[in-house]
Amino acid sequence: MTLAADLPYRLCVGVMLINRDGHVFVGKRADVPFAPEGTGHWWQMPQGGLDEGEDPEAAALRELEEETGVTSASILGRTRQWYSYDLPQGLVGTAWHGRYRGQTQLWFAARFEGQDSEIDLEPKPGYEREFDAWKWASYGELPDLVVPFKRPVYEGVIREFEHFVLGT
């Protein structure tokens, strides 16, 4: 049995994509490895791994494009801190090929400057589908849409980016 304390966190970036109406993009995960069936906790904002030596802002824009097809976005700001979460014990040693105990994430707020028709969940060749549906959600409902172990991260990101959402 792998002990979480023996494993590192996976370095990641996340994007809170905010539209003109002050709503936030969320995608419904195509695979639901972390959400028990029937819970509805299948939604999340775009996020993904930070490659070694990669600039975090560039990684955030890359992940946004890979997962949503969106290129019409501008960065508004980033969180003051990295946010970490631990996987539930039952997933440690299996998720991400057993290499990580969870993720530590730097988040970016971005303004969506395109049209909804730009959003394309079809993956590029060589990539796996991240989301099979999407919607614009109010920022206040985000914590209830994600798996419970990510909720504190989302609450922190919301606190830091609330002024971007309300300033739209």
Regions found by a protein language model. Give the residues of each.
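NUDIX/MutT-family hydrolases
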Residues: W107-R111, E118-P152
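The catalytic Nudix box helix
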Residues: M45-R80, S138
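Residues that scaffold the ATP/ADP-binding catalytic core of kinase and kinase-like folds
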Residues: G27, G53, L145
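N-terminal strand-loop-strand
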Residues: T2-M45
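Active-site-adjacent beta-strand/loop module that shapes the phosphate/pyrophosphate-binding cleft
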Residues: Q81-D120
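Charge-dense polyanion-binding interfaces
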Residues: R159-T168
